[in-house]
Amino acid sequence: MSVLIVTGTGTEVGKTVVTAALAALAADRGTAVAVVKPAQTGVRAGELGDVDLVRDLSGVDDVHELSRYADPLAPVSAARRAGLPTPDLGTVAVAVRRLQADRGLVLVEGAGGLLVRYDHDGSTLADLARTLAAPVLVVTTAGLGTLNATALTLEVMANRGLDLAGIVVGSWPVEPDLAARSNIVDLELLAARPLAGAVPAGAGLLGTGQFLQIARSSLEPALGGAFNAAEFRRRYAV
């Protein structure tokens, strides 16, 4: 897996923290890792963006923000309002392949969900994943409403022939409610596999050393960590 696409079932689901966890684990095992953000929205010039958070949490400096728009909208909408060119996913694919040539892992974090539009032709992160023949890691929420959003994302992936790298809960609550605990089993049924991880809420506020420890316990071995889905299920599921 030299390229991994990280998408979410929506906005503010924990994609950036999960991306940082993946980067931290890769770097810790000695893998040369790069992180690419094709389009950053909702951040003005001079402000810190998602790749800056990834750098701060993971200690990985090889991060690349390819375009930025001030309004917190889909990339195509934010570009239109700013009077700027939309992101070119063909150019993004070239950049990722260039990085891939001498890195062991390239992480590509999308904006919002899988079908958010990047340009006026309707290009999406799903199209980029297909172009790169890269698996997709889906970051989702824990609580009420996650099952429908996750099912829709997985259905789109199946219809487009995209490979699922796993489902990760991006922010597992300190005190999970009934819905969150019940959703563990249902998310695994949707994915037809165990959860690939669950990152504790607040992980994005930790320092680099503590964050690495959390990353290791929050992601499954296939992603570089030591997360045990069966143990997590026994502890929380109802």
Swiss-Prot record:
Cofactor annotation = Mg(2+)
Q: Provide the binding site for ATP.
A: 12-17, 50, 109-112, 170-171, 200-202
Mind listing the GO molecular function terms for this protein?
Answer: ATP binding; dethiobiotin synthase activity; magnesium ion binding
Keyword line: ATP-binding, Biotin biosynthesis, Cytoplasm, Ligase, Magnesium, Metal-binding, Nucleotide-binding
Binding-site residues for Mg(2+), renumbered to this chain: T16, D50, E109
Q: Which HAMAP family match?
A: BioD (MF_00336)
Name listed for the protein in its UniProt record: ATP-dependent dethiobiotin synthetase BioD
- What's the name of its gene? bioD
